[in-house]
Amino acid sequence: GAVIKVRTSFQEITDTGIRTSEGKVDCKIFVDARGVSSLVQKDRTGILSSAQYEIYADWIKKGKVEVIFDQEKYPGFFAWIIPSNEGKGKVGVAGKGINVAEALDSILKEKGKFSTIRKIYAPIWIKGPIEKFVEGKTVIIGDAAGQAKPTTAGGIFTSGMGGVYAGQ
């Protein structure tokens, strides 16, 4: 069986498993799912800041996705408005070297009245999958392996293929 630890910091790989902030864990395979933060050490140039708000707004129309390409405002990426229903959706922005909170607030101010359901600020990886995601008894998955698709927040296919290769 698997052991899943949350609110626990990985510290190092040992001969019999790993050491965490809560002590040693014996394991045959260590799955690294630490997210984009583990890529920071490898290559900062592949990381963009992003902000996304889930909101209610009369100007969000069901079935009307907006993608805003403006390399001056959102260098290296874009802004988006994705409805989840009539009057409800996700509005976001990502870019290199910008204040994403200010950029998103500017979009929302232009669009009109809204009420916020939740706010998410997160780094996103844009350079694709890492070259080596299986090393010894460590398997790196998901965002930590660059297996997510930043344009859709997806990554089922790339993560699934990673699992197939790891199994081999």
Show the residue positions of the predicted features.
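Residue-level marker for buried hydrophobic side chains located in beta-strands
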Residues: 138-140
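An active-site-proximal "capping" alpha-helix that borders the catalytic cofactor pocket
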Residues: 155-168
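Glycine-rich phosphate/pyrophosphate-binding beta-alpha loops
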Residues: 145-157
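A generic short alpha-helical patch detector that favors 3-5-residue windows
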Residues: 133-136, 158
